[in-house]
Regions:
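Short loop/turn segments that connect beta-strands within beta-propeller blades
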Residues: 9-13, 58-62, 103-107, 154-156
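Non-catalytic accessory segments flanking enzyme active sites
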Residues: 1, 90, 110-204
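A flexible loop/linker signature enriched in serine peptidases of the S9 family
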Residues: 1-6, 17-26, 38-55, 66-76, ...
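Residue-level detector of Asp-centered blade-edge/turn motifs that repeat once per structural unit
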Residues: 32-33, 82-83, 131-133
Length: 205
């Protein structure tokens, strides 16, 4: 679990590692002006689970630093904004996959939520997004009622552009999905769950 990032000269074939810490470094993205590289990784503490963070360095591997954000979540799928002032990323928060962005000094914000999975038969979270040079984003959109569609947006907006399950929903009615939280009897921690009620459920019956 100790991967490094390399620079490869495609003419000579020479390559050089530009990271060297004890821990994984992966998913490099070069800034649009070609001066910086953003990447994901963490210092390996040999634990069963560790969260990936965003790091930035110069193109030659110098001046590495971690972007310190007030966000206790695992980060994935990074993109530079068109002007290289922000980095967009993906993360999961309480069962919902979101797109966020941060400045290079860690000023973080949530851009949009309801990033959905890739299976049209199941409303799983996860999924992917991409970012254009003018900061418009496209992503796999999904809710409990509309799994595996596509959406696009700009500056926090979102517009669904597909309706892949329309032929099914024309004659099927879904039950209402409710999020619930309850306290563990073992250690008092809060546990998240969901209730799916039958279609046309009447609480009085």
């Amino acid at each position: 679990n100790n991967t490094e990032l390399y620079i490869l000269d495609i003419i000579s074939g020479k390559h050089e590692a530009i990271t060297d810490r004890d821990g994984p470094d992966f998913s490099p993205k070069v800034s649009n002006d070609r001066s910086l590289i953003a990447y994901l990784g963490y210092d390996d503490e040999y634990l069963s689970y560790q969260q990936s963070s965003i790091y930035v360095m110069r193109r030659d591997g110098s001046d590495k630093y971690k972007i310190e954000m007030d966000l206790d979540r695992n980060i994935s799928n990074i993109f530079w904004s068109g002007n290289d002032k922000r980095i967009y990323f993906q993360y999961d928060d309480n069962g919902i996959t979101k797109i966020g962005s941060t400045t290079l000094d860690g000023s973080q914000e949530t851009v949009v939520d309801e990033v959905g999975g890739l299976s049209f038969s199941r409303p799983y979270s996860g999924g992917f997004f991409s970012l254009s040079k003018n900061n418009r984003y496209s992503f796999t959109y999904g809710t409990a009622y509309n799994p595996a569609d596509l959406a696009t947006g700009y500056k926090g907006s979102k517009r669904r552009i597909t309706n892949l399950n329309k032929d099914l929903f024309d004659y099927k009615k879904l039950g209402k999905v409710e999020e619930i939280w309850y306290q563990s009897s073992y250690d008092g921690r809060m546990i998240q769950g969901w209730i799916v009620k039958p279609p046309n459920f009447d609480n009085s019956k």
